[in-house]
Amino acid sequence: MVTIRLARHGAKKRPFYQIVVADSRFKATGRYIEKVGFFNPTAQGQEEGLRLDLDRVGHWVEQGAGLSDRVAKLVKDAKKAA
């Protein structure tokens, strides 16, 4: 099954997440099909904390991709802000 989920990057104690479309059998930070955005939970001030391509997310959901719990919340927040 194809899933849209977070892939953790960044340094120790400084997480940075790529939002990726990946087969659920692939490891979390490994192979992915497409990158659709990023999430920076430690963004401060004018730094961009979330960038998400809602068109591509919508496309993958139409194709049957599932959303992880955290990504579903981020998509909901991004739609509200847009």
Swiss-Prot record:
SUPFAM superfamilies according to UniProt: Ribosomal protein S16 (SSF54565)
One Pfam family from the record: Ribosomal_S16
PROSITE patterns found in the cross-reference section: RIBOSOMAL_S16
Keywords, ordered alphabetically: Ribonucleoprotein, Ribosomal protein
Annotated GO CC locations: cytoplasm; small ribosomal subunit
Superkingdom, taxonomy of origin: Bacteria
Biological process terms in GO annotation: translation
GO MF term set: structural constituent of ribosome
InterPro entries, per database record: Ribosomal_bS16, Ribosomal_bS16_CS, Ribosomal_bS16_dom_sf
Family (UniProt): Belongs to the bacterial ribosomal protein bS16 family.
Protein name stated in the entry: Small ribosomal subunit protein bS16
Species, as recorded: Aliivibrio fischeri (strain ATCC 700601 / ES114) (Vibrio fischeri)
Gene expressing this chain: rpsP
